[in-house]
Structures are given as structure tokens and as C-alpha cells.
């Protein structure tokens, strides 16, 4: 009797465990999910956020997956710019959020009060400045100045964070032992807030790029304005995707916001590559056959990793870039490339078969848009469509590289794709007429046929430029073809 009772109890417990495994995840309100009755499910948390966009409050409600929750980006508010809440019960994000209202204006001051308020601090600052100058003329100040360590290096913070390790060591340790999604949030903030900006090295759609120094190491700092918070947030989110790190994808270091009470800067810190973008590199340099193959192979390797889904508990979703061009690819010291600027990227959830398209009004670069994007025939409900559009753009980048390859002393001057067919800043209509209606593609010079490497590269380009996206090569196929070419040409990629 006792044995039968124990057996029945064991079966009941197994049934309860099975039911728990099959139970649906957390249900949340999702304002972006009109196809699923504005509802989504997740194993992470429900998310509600209100942000200031063009002077108006914009509300977003959605699900946060466990990897995204662990990245600690979603549940973070910034002063007067966003208010964000994460919660963990069904439909708990069905709430109304508002940005904090400014405190009521203080009563107006009269002329006498204003004069006192202005005069007193100015006098005090003047006295303090005079005392400082007088003190620094003395021997004691001179001695300290000589013996003082470099003020640009906040050594205590450096020692606290890295303990003798380089940034690459820190990132490798976290990638090898943790989630693979980047440094902990506290370390990111410590790094970002102890960086000394050196010089501006570029400007883009979303802000400026600076060369910075942290503990004697070079870093790149992409600075967004507060009105582009959505772009900063999206790019930081993509860069912190689990298992994204790859030698041919720009190495992400930190994301942080700098708020001094009057304005907010949003920082994205990454590895610094002094050679600059591929566009700048090709304008300055001629490449050898081996150099061309190294550049092309590294781009294909980075894109293949981006496009590939890694299945597992520490897996990576497939990602499409959506803005591949020579200005968004950086050249490293070793003459290989790293794909950058992931702010427009999309992620594919193969389990739910959904595409995480960013709510961003900015699109890719018109000159590099695939035919199906120009004539609006692209099926945005199929993730493969985005990968195929990337391949078309890569073909154009390869054309830019191959033109600068010197064979027998013959080399073409650097030009952008379609330079002889459209103006310097073409419209979508102008690109559609050339690419879709007239079906033109960049010309491939006849002299490329005399060089095996250029002949293979020309064939790859043509197979990337097919009007039918399904007929184009995959990034992995391109990588394998160029790898074989690398072996034939005996180049060390």
C-alpha cells in the first residue's frame, strides 16, 4: 500500500514538473506587436519606457529577453530624457509613464538681487584665480608640477579596474568566462568616465567620433546627442548581443551617458583603429593582390559571423547589418578589416520567427541599397531578405577595393560605386532609375581578366549584384571562395 502511494506521488510530481516546463512565459503588452494582438511573451521581463523625442513624449512597451535583461541596458533611466521600468508579472507594463516635470519656476528676482547674485561669485572666482596664480609661482608648486604623474591618466581608477591588464585582456576574460555580451555595467561606466578625449576623427549621421585615451591605451568614442538616444541605445544593445565578439567586428568596450544637468551626451566606446575607415584607407593607399585578398577575406569573415546563428544556451541570433559601405568598415593595423556601425542592424529570433527591426526613421545609404530596397519589393517579413541586401552592398565594397589593386603597375583611382552614373548625393529615385530600371552595375575593367585574383573577385562581385536576391552568394560562400584564393596566392590573411 505504501509503495503504491509513493509511486502515485512520484507520478504526480513528474506531471507538475512537465506542466511547469510547458507553461508559457511572462505575458506583456507590446505596442509594436500588432500582428499578435499587441501581446508578447518572454522569459525575461516586461518593459515600459517613455522618452523625449522632438519635444514630445513617446511611449514604448515590449518584452525584454533574458540576455537583454542581463546586459542591464533596458532597465536604465536617464535624467529628463527617458523613464524606464522593468517588471516581472503578466501585463505589468500596462502602466502610464511620464517624464519628471520640471520644478515650478522660482519667483522673479529684482535688479538688486540679480546684481548681488552675479557680482559675488565673480569676485570670489577672481580672488581664487589670483591666489592660485600666486601659489603656482612658488617653488613648492613648481616642484609638485615636475614630480606629478600625467594628469590625463586617472591612475587610481585604472588600477582599480584593470589591475595590470589591458582592455583586450579584460574583454577576453569576460568573453571566455561569462555571457560573452561584454563587460559588466559598472566596469563600463568606470572606463567611460575616466577617458580623456584627444581629438575628433570623424562625424557621422548620429554624432562625432573621437580618439580617446584610457590608462595609456587608445580608444574610440562615438558621441551621440540626447535627441539620438534611440540610435545610441540600439547600437549598444546590438554590440552587447551574446557571442557577437569577433576579430572582424569592431570590438565594443563600454556604453554610458554623461549628464551635467544642462545637456546629455551618450557615449559608445570601442577599440581604436588609427588607419580609419576603408574609405579613407583606399583614398590614401594602393593595395597589392595579397592586400586586396586580406581585406576582402576579413570583411567576408566578419559578415559571415554576423549573419550566422549560433544555437545554444549561450547562442547568438542571426544579425543583418543593413548599412554595409566602405565608411562603415575600419582597417586595423594588420591590414585586415573590422565591420562597424551596427545601429541599423536587425536580429532574427529563429524560435519565434520574428525580426527585431529597430524603430528608427533613418535607413541605409542610398548608393549601397540593393535593387529590392530601391523599388520597394523587398519582403521585410523574411530575414533572408536583409542578409541578401547586405551581400549586394559587400559586392560594391569589393569593387572599391579591387580598383585600388595594383597589377603590372596599373591601378585605378579611387571612386565610389556608380560615381559615373549618379551625383555625389543621389536620391532614391536616381538610384532606382540606374540600378532597377536600366539595370546598370559598376563596370569591371578588362585588364582584371589578366590576373587570377582580380578575375575571381570580379566573378564574386557579379554574383553579389544579381537583381534576384535569392540568386546571390551567401557570406559564408564568399568567405570560402576567397579563402581558396588566399591559398593559391600564398597570402597570410
UniProtKB/Swiss-Prot annotation:
SUPFAM superfamilies in alphabetical order: Protein kinase-like (PK-like) (SSF56112), Snake toxin-like (SSF57302)
GO BP, sorted A to Z: activin receptor signaling pathway; apoptotic nuclear changes; apoptotic signaling pathway; cell differentiation; cellular response to growth factor stimulus; insulin secretion; lipid storage; negative regulation of chorionic trophoblast cell proliferation
EC number: 2.7.11.30
Keywords, comma-separated and alphabetical: Apoptosis, ATP-binding, Kinase, Magnesium, Manganese, Membrane, Metal-binding, Nucleotide-binding, Receptor, Serine/threonine-protein kinase, Signal, Transferase, Transmembrane, Transmembrane helix
Cytoplasmic face residues: 135-493
InterPro entries assigned: Activin_recp (IPR000472), GS_dom (IPR003605), Kinase-like_dom_sf (IPR011009), Prot_kinase_dom (IPR000719), Protein_kinase_ATP_BS (IPR017441), Ser-Thr/Tyr_kinase_cat_dom (IPR001245), Ser/Thr_kinase_AS (IPR008271), Snake_toxin-like_sf (IPR045860)
Effect of substituting residue 194 to D: Pro-apoptotic
Alphabetized GO MF terms: activin receptor activity; activin receptor activity, type I; ATP binding; growth factor binding; metal ion binding; nodal binding; protein serine/threonine kinase activity
Family to which the UniProt record says this protein belongs: Belongs to the protein kinase superfamily. TKL Ser/Thr protein kinase family. TGFB receptor subfamily.
Complex formation: Binds the type 2 receptor protein ACVR2A.
Protein name (Swiss-Prot/TrEMBL): Activin receptor type-1C
Lineage: Eukaryota, Metazoa, Chordata, Craniata, Vertebrata
Gene for this chain: ACVR1C
